[in-house]
């Protein structure tokens, strides 16, 4: 199953020097930063999710401006998405998995996304899909619900938190069939790559790390279990397990029990 990963930039280190003579040299403006994350292959060399490189570019204010995802084997561009910022608003344009993407996002006074209207058009067939995502937050600034509206149908996801950790999400279909529950157990690794926003966000979960989707969990999950219900009876369960290594307070690697592994390369970020 394809996993949508998000990557959090670490705090930049500010170096100061002292001198008896006053230095009137102006402080240089920060420059845009790029960081790349490489997704590896399983131990047997069989590609699971594709040999993919993810590159994230940020502006001088450390805001995400571009996501570039490309397969290394054949140089196929999976995603190339651009972000433009204005007061209380983000515009998104680009391509994602064979679709032209446009989206308009509304932010509240805390910089959290409250609504996204998204349109995707197939580059081969012209098929068009229009969706609206509505987001709510609890008193602690954590995501409480997301509602996806498409062709008049609504699908709501509810998030359950305990002690600052996301423990489960519940997806209510509004019918007797297809309700889903995602449940998580936590690890000791810091939350720098997230799984819980997959398919809830219009393919731009990376904005989570700018605070656009509220407060992050404290730690990464050690397990992620998906259970599908029909008429209240569980009919399918799939569990993924994750093992991490951390270097200098940052994620270095993530190994999944299904065989896929990820290596993280970090740029100097705010």
Segments predicted by a language model, with ranges:
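Positively charged n-region of N-terminal signal peptides that target proteins for export
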Residues: 1-4, 20
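Buried hydrophobic residues that stabilize the cores of well-folded domains
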Residues: 21-270
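Sec-dependent signal peptide hydrophobic core
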Residues: 5-9
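C-terminal motif of bacterial Sec signal peptides marking the signal peptidase cleavage site
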Residues: 14-17
């Amino acid at each position: 199953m394809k996993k949508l990963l998000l990557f959090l930039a670490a705090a930049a280190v500010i170096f100061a020097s002292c001198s008896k003579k006053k230095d009137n040299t102006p402080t240089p403006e920060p420059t845009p930063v790029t960081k790349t994350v490489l997704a590896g292959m399983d131990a047997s060399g069989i590609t699971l999710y594709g040999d993919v490189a993810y590159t994230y570019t940020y502006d001088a204010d450390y805001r995400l401006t571009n996501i570039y995802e490309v397969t290394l084997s054949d140089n196929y561009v999976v995603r190339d998405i651009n972000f433009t910022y204005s007061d209380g608003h983000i515009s998104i344009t680009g391509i994602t998995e064979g679709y032209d993407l446009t989206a308009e996002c509304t932010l509240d006074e805390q910089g959290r996304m409250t609504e996204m209207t998204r349109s995707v058009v197939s580059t081969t067939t012209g098929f068009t899909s229009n969706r609206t995502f509505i987001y709510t937050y609890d008193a602690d600034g954590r995501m409480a619900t997301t509602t996806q509206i498409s062709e008049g149908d609504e699908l709501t996801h509810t998030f359950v938190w305990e002690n600052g950790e996301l423990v489960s999400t519940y997806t209510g279909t509004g019918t007797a069939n297809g309700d889903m529950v995602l449940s998580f157990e936590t690890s000791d690794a810091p939350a720098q790559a997230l799984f819980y926003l997959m398919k809830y966000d219009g393919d731009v979960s990376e904005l989570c790390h700018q605070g656009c989707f509220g407060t992050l969990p404290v730690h990464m999950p050690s397990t992620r279990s998906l259970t599908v219900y029909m008429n209240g009876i569980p009919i399918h369960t799939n569990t993924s397990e994750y093992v991490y290594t951390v270097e200098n307070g940052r994620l270095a690697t993530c190994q999944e029990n299904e065989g896929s592994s990820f290596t993280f390369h970090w740029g100097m970020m705010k």
